[in-house]
Regions:
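Extracellular beta-rich repeat passengers
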Residues: 1-116
Length: 116
């Protein structure tokens, strides 16, 4: 990407084996949405994955085997409903200014993630 937003979601979106590079915001879940990513790469974005929703029509809380590299903020959780634990098992966070900015204090599990 060349700035802007790579994926601007307003519904449930399931991403598998996708690459997001060079965006202002790679993927964002807007109101009513949930963006799930598995085996995806987020690199050189200002924000990799962003949640800014107060309700969601469907959830998918497993964020396994993703790579977040050299982003300003890898994952930004401004607002996210529910109490499903976001699981980053197998995901790698490397060279980001901020790995996870969880303003919403949503439950997350990084026990099986790697931080470099």
């Amino acid at each position: 990407g060349k700035g802007g937003i790579g994926l601007d979601a307003y519904c449930l979106v399931l991403l598998t084996d996708c690459n997001f590079t060079g965006w202002d915001t790679a993927a964002v879940a807007q109101n009513g949405a949930w963006v799930n990513a598995m085996e995806c790469t987020f690199a050189n974005n200002t924000v990799g994955l962003k949640f800014n929703t107060s309700m969601a029509y469907g959830t998918a809380p497993n964020y396994v085997n993703n790579t977040f590299t050299d982003n300003g903020t890898a994952v930004c959780i401004d607002s996210l409903p529910g109490n499903e634990v976001i699981d980053f098992a197998g995901s790698v966070f490397s060279g980001n200014d901020t790995d996870i900015d969880n303003k919403a204090e949503h439950p997350i599990d990084t026990a099986k993630a790697t931080f470099e």
